[in-house]
A protein has these predicted regions:
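Short, basic/aromatic beta-hairpin or loop at an interaction surface
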Residues: 62-72, 110-125
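Loop/turn positions that initiate beta-strands
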Residues: 86, 93, 133-141
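Glycine-rich phosphate/diphosphate-binding loop of Rossmann-like nucleotide-binding domains
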Residues: 149-197
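N-terminal small/polar loop signature for handling phosphorylated ligands or for N-terminal nucleophile
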Residues: 178-180, 185-220, 224-239
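Proline/glycine-rich low-complexity loops and linkers
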Residues: 231-309
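Short alpha-helix capping/helix-loop boundary micro-motifs
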Residues: 74-77, 81-82, 125-134
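Electropositive, beta-rich accessory/interaction domains or terminal extensions
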Residues: 1-103
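Mid-chain, well-packed structural core segment of small domains
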Residues: 77-109, 241-262, 266
Length: 309
């Protein structure tokens, strides 16, 4: 976990102008008091690494001071643009959550761009919102805490639970999700669970992992019309909202080659912090469903954080 030194804290009364270095800033739930960018939005605090500034200086042949790129906090020791939305910066009681990497350049409306024809903030600056406020001074350090995504995979199969055969679908989902997280650079923890086809056990386990704020919950099995298929009707009462489009599109896409896909009652939705997907039980089906769901996972994660569309 890298330690990030704070070289300067900076404020301005107007947007689109350089910020001036000050001895201390006061972070509140709305951002930095007395700074033009404070407010109830996701870009309350801007940060830029001195390493990015120095690289830009070498490219344009000019020197820049703290706050010249309108950053609130100038740092050293970590290339901030390697962070991702959901990562956190902590200094004592102060905690910031990264919400955006880079931004659209203001072009000629930006003082730096006007002078140099380019700017570093749109590509290498980051933005954050305040989760816990306090007073922050130059010389302090941030601990960088990457967002660790929690995945819980629940296989429903009485026969697999009794050892009649091995669970292959749950591990296949775990493999696909692990590959997805590796591609995105997401730290993750993937936990597999195996339970019989019982309403009580599924309800209890779902309630537990939702309470633990699991980010993504995948179930496999129990989505058909057989006498032991109980997954959708057990999951649905726990949802605050459904997300019907994903499963509808999967059924539409794969039913052209296999009409039996239309018999799946798979659903998706949100319960508290958790996004839940109920998948069929076959290995082939979980490959198809998980592959399609992964297309939307990053967007869903950021929307759930309140980071827009």
């Amino acid at each position: 976990m890298p330690s990030i030194k704070i070289l300067s804290v900076n404020v301005s009364e107007q947007k689109g102008t350089p910020k001036r270095s000050v001895p201390e800033i006061d972070l509140s739930p709305l951002g930095i008091e007395s700074d033009a960018h404070a407010g109830s939005w996701h870009r309350q605090v801007s940060l830029l690494a001195i390493e990015s500034v120095q690289k830009f200086e070498g490219q344009c042949g000019k020197k820049f001071g703290y706050g010249d790129f309108a950053e609130n906090i100038t740092t050293q020791g970590f290339l901030l643009y390697h962070a991702k939305p959901g990562d956190r910066l902590r200094c004592g009681e102060i905690e910031l959550e990264v919400t955006q990497i880079g931004k659209k350049c203001h072009g000629t409306g930006c003082a730096v761009y006007h002078n140099t024809g380019a700017c570093v903030m749109p590509k290498e600056g980051i933005f954050a919102r305040v989760l816990q406020g306090g007073k922050l001074q130059a010389g302090a350090t941030f601990d960088f805490i990457p967002k660790n995504y929690q995945f819980d995979i629940i296989t429903l199969s009485t026969r697999a639970y009794k050892g009649v055969y091995a669970d292959l679908s749950g591990p296949e989902i775990a493999r696909l999700l692990g590959d997805f997280c590796a591609e995105k650079g997401w730290p993750c923890q993937i936990t597999n669970h195996l339970i019989p086809d019982e309403v009580g056990q599924l309800t209890s386990l779902l309630t537990q992992v939702i309470h633990q704020k699991s980010d993504f919950i995948f179930t496999t099995g129990g989505t058909g019309v057989g006498p032991t298929d109980i997954t959708p009707e057990t999951v649905k009462p726990l949802l605050q909202r459904e997300i019907p489009g994903i499963m509808e599109e999967i059924r539409r896409k794969y039913s052209a080659a296999n009409p039996a896909v239309l018999l799946s009652r798979s659903i998706a939705g949100q319960s508290g912090n958790s996004l839940i997907f109920t998948l069929p039980g076959s290995v082939k089906a979980v490959r198809e469903y998980t592959t399609e769901i992964c297309v939307h996972l990053e967007h869903l994660a950021y929307m759930r954080m309140g980071l827009g569309h």
